Amino acid sequence: PPRSTLFPYTTLFRSLMVVSGGRIIEVGEYSELSAKFSSEISIVHFKDSLIMPGFIDSHIHYPQYKVISSYGTSLLEWLNKYTFVEEQKFSDIDYAARVAELFLDELIKNGTTTAMTFCTSHKQSVDVFYSAAEKRNLRMIAGKVMMDRKDRKSVV
């Protein structure tokens, strides 16, 4: 069977995925690859399991983790009533780190391994986010939010 993302609807049965340094280096028939790598690898057998790639989230805000589903009649009302209040707490590096850990654990629980993530305007929110992501071997693109209107001085 084809072994490429050019054939996305292909299912491999009785196969082996060889991972080194957190990266997939080869995928193929179990009988072929287990012989090829027999002295180099330890095998973890996921019998009767489905192995899939991690999901990619192209737009997510980690500082809004604790205000998910908060009610607002408009975007500005929601930002002022919940989001900005929550985001100003990220000036505390310990708070930002705790939320980063919770947020990333939730992503992993739901199969997301890569994300384009918005942090807050506080530099430390980005630093602790990357530290937590690195500990979990996640692939993240992140940066601090920039605002130039309708902002609160406490979050810039």
Regions found by a protein language model. Give the residues of each.
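Histidine-rich, glycine-flanked metal-binding segment
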Residues: 10-52
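Metal-coordinating catalytic core of metallo-dependent amide/deamination hydrolases
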Residues: 124-156
